[in-house]
């Protein structure tokens, strides 16, 4: 139940609120008054009164504070300042909860965790050795207001999902600052004083929310099982039973320790292929994927969430049509998978034939095993040769298959479009024959080579770009410093990490890839008042990406000068003097620094084969209180669910804007609810404000694709790029993804569509079932042809 606060009061005196003087209510009001001293737009009396209405007869101060936290959260949609109040109340509760378990300081917190079998010996010894210095570091950071940087929902996410808990009492044994310093200490190089300085640098970045590692690192750094990698990519099992079942085992072990899985299945023979050992015929990939589906669901990620995997299939595989039906809600359940994510690994030849309205041939890998390991011109030649030799199992119009792929995307959001040739063509790891990227990962931002003996691994972290806007400018030097520290510790994960399989450990030690990403791009544009799809925004996005790559490469070169280049250095394109931007016709903003970097790389090499990848950042962006990765905002008003009810959160930048205009009032708030968070119909606010605060549904998707393409030269891996269409159609989708391919994108992620519901209804408790957006049930050939042949005028991209 969500507490509904009463109308605001002008005063906060107990006698004016009906609160008993001297009772727990008066104590609560005093606390609220103190916490809101610098929050003039909040009303502590209103929050206190709401909390008292919801209390039980025996309520103590802690229960009243919890009720007040809920009441303040219920007012966030009226004023974002209530998020700060709710966070401050929750901070008090978390601090008391941890203290109740003995965690009264950072060193005490680690000691409790170690005693209960949560903290690794190595981390506990490091903290014990430097206890006084580390405790003082936390106290100093708290004095600077570190805890006050959290919004309510970010802090609630930390408390519910990330803070270590006592195995018996289930109470937290660390505060948010203890948690962040524990993560940093888990990455200490050794026990030296210099290591303490490095740890302090990372901790300061995290406490300022300038940078956050990905969730597996936050979950596990410093613990007894430090599995800190986010992504694992596995090559397709070989076309034999032992290999298929060995992959099940590998996936289960990786998933158990919170890794997201990307897995190719393109080597397995198609349905109807001869099995020579039994003189029978294969049932194809679907039964094996059904087993994988059940396994992924059964093995949860450290007890925190279900396992997750994405299966990639090359577009020439003869089981592609059945693959497209795996997530359907109708049909034989034995041929459906309800947990696996699906992705297409699309060669350029297929897209060219779609454009030309030519035929496309489907093969069984048993007949053309070489196709999986070829890309570019070599793939094209081998594919055409197989056609000429009559090896195809089926030939069909390429547009028919493409249309079915688009329909699956429209209906399920699945069947992500990722591009094999673009991914391999510029990949730093594919310099030599035989090293091939066979798929991306669960979130389509990782591009790394795999084979039967190597499972690709990536350690992720994200820079909060919004934190570097200072007085209307980007603080480029502080951004450089942040990237250098982030890369140092991402590289450290390679050495400290726990690897669930031998194949993963072998690959990561050889290639040492990391994935530094970004979040809060939308925050940058709001702060600088740039519409998301404006030329200025695109130019700044590209410039930020270039600077992050430049600083990351410099940091990797620093590491190579100290520790030597990666073991597989000679197998990289960079070792041949080709940096990732060299593959693109792009003008550099800092050519002198790039030239100096090239000279250093030629002399010392680099410590990492790959450095940049933009991941989705859903949870860490929530912790940091910024918008996800490189995405536009989805709404100016959105729902947050908690165990005690649903709350609405409003765009704080918009509220400040409307306050300055004098129109942030009850009428505007109600209009925002009725419009599901859109301000486009608000004629009473200036047009430039409406343009600035458009949502992802109101921004032409061509703008998102162009921005993604512009930053691609400065991403040596890839980016999780969601696309948004309120009512997807075959025509819109076919043009949109053809345009993405032509612009050279390596991957795309989910297609987001939106059910026709009102936020106001959802939050009021009278929500009706969401009506699905209308979806095409058959491919409209005319619409498909029109959109493909006229991509410049397609409505989806304008």
Say what each PLM segment does:
Residues 1-798:
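Extended catalytic cores of very large enzyme megasubunits
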